[in-house]
Every structure is written in C-alpha cells, then in structure tokens.
Amino acid sequence: MAELSGPCGPGCIGSASFRGGLPLAIDPMPQSAQHRAMTLAITPSGQACGARVTGVDLTRPLAPGTIAAIRAAWLDHHVLAFPGQRMNADDLERFTSYFGGFGDDPFIRPIPGRDHIIAVQRKADETAPLFAENWHSDWSFQARPPAGTCLLGITIPPVGGNTEFSNQHAALDAMPAQLRARIEGLQAVHSARNGYAPTGMYGANDKGRSMDIRSDDEALEIRHHPFVRDHPETGREGLFGCAGYIIGFDGLDDSEGLPLLYELIQWQGREEFRYNHEWEPDMLVMWDNRSLLHRATGGYDGHDRLLHRTTIAAWGGA
C-alpha cells in the first residue's frame, strides 16, 4: 500500500514523486485547515489494473496537493475506487472538474437540474438488454474523446452488477509480434451508429428502458483515431478502442477489417488484462478511457441499480 499526500515538491515527475515507477509520500505545504492536504492510502487490486483509495473525503474541497496525488495514482493504476463517499451532485461535479472539466455526453439526457450528470440505471423488473455490456472506451467516436469517467454508486444490488476493465497497455505489451505487425499504423474508424443511430441498439426499437437515451442521426458520423497510440500524459503506448465503436480501419475493406476487429477484441479482453470491480453503495470510481476498455455485467435481476456518471474532458496539456 502506498501513501500520497501534498503537492509536488523537489524530485517530482509530473505531479508526484516516483521511485521505481511507484508514487511516494509527498510532504504537504502549509495550507488552510479547510483545504489541508489529506493522506491517501492506495491499495492495488492485485489484478491487471485498479486500486482502492482511502484517507480522503470527497464531500469536501480538495487541496491542490491531494488532487495531484490522486491524478498520479489514476495514471499509475488506471482505475481508482473511493469507498464510503456519501457524495451529492455538487460533490460529484466538483470532483470531476479537478481533472480537466466536463466532457460532452451525447445521446443520454442528464438528470433534472444538471448539465453534466447522467443516470446509469436499471429497474428491478426491466427486460431491455443490459446497457453497455460490450467492451468499449467511452465516447471514442468523438473528435476529442473524454480522458476519463467518474461513476458514483447510489443504489447497488446485493449481487451482480460488477464492472470489468481491461488494461490496453498490457494488451499491447503482450501482443504477439505477428498480430502487432498487422495493426501498426492503422487508423481506426469510430462511430456511434451501432448504438445510438435510430436503427441502432438504443434506437427506435429499444423499448422498456429506464435510462433516458435519445438516438439521433448524429451517430452516423465517423472519426479516425490511431489504433496504437501514446497516452497523452504518460507517453505509454496502448491500444485505443475496440469493435463496437470501431466499425473498421481506414484503407481496409470490410472483408479484411471486420475479421481483424473480431480477432483483436478476443485478444483485448483476455482475462490476464482484466480487473473485475465489485461495487459498494457510496463508492466513487474514476477510470482512464485512454488506457482501458470496460463493460457492464448483469446478474442482478429483481434489483434496482442506480449510478450517477460524469465524464472528464480530453486533456488539454496543462
């Protein structure tokens, strides 16, 4: 378990001190009592990514040093879980804003009275297909996809409903040379059409869903992103996106591109690259869309489930 506190001091790399790739404790600078840096306890999951963070109260404004320490841990572990956070909507929006402002959430109407919070929910008796059950990186079809996502557990079923994450740095590192040679230099074609176009999964024929999803022809637009790319903050190479929002590769016809996408998703979601996250009520989870794929799982029929979600805007380099 590592402990982090305070702002960056001498010997920093980025926003935290490192030795052997692991963040170390940082001595806090004098601050007011209200904004005094908190000491974070970070416990890695022991899986391919993910860590549990305690020693911080996210219902209070955070000191710059605490924010820097959380960001360093986020970049290192890719998924952070903060248990025991009885956050309201103001708290969730304030926390999100520390890490780059709000991303644009298309196709899903925000909760009443808020512009940046959407409800990820499912009623106990709902029969519509599970939302977001396939691997994806949130909104990868945008020109500037969000850097991260924050998800706050409000009503959590007693069974099921885990979220799985897959580390795409690890997936690239372990990829066989022959497969890697086939993807070098490829531009992936991203689109929301399979999900959010009027003919898509969440389109006109999607009935009985409690989430407020609004399909639109805007989902037919396409964007190109490198399939192998450097993380904009850490510089580490990884895979970005997967079949679903990726509908092909520029320069490859479907007879070649679609079988390659299928082969890749089998690789990208392998067990050894995964972290299986178990939810708790009042738990906030933040993850890095630039490093990961994720997907929802079911297993909680007969139970309500409600989480509030924000997205962190693409990193501006500051």
Question: How would you label these PLM feature ranges?
Answer:
Residues 1, 13, 26-29:
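Short hydrophobic transmembrane-like helices used for membrane targeting/insertion
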Residues 1-7:
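Extreme N-terminal basic, low-complexity initiation segments
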Residues 25-284, 290-318:
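Non-heme Fe(II) oxygenase catalytic core, chiefly the N-lobe of the double-stranded beta-helix
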Residues 4, 22-24:
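Leucine-biased recognition of intrinsically disordered, low-complexity hydrophobic segments
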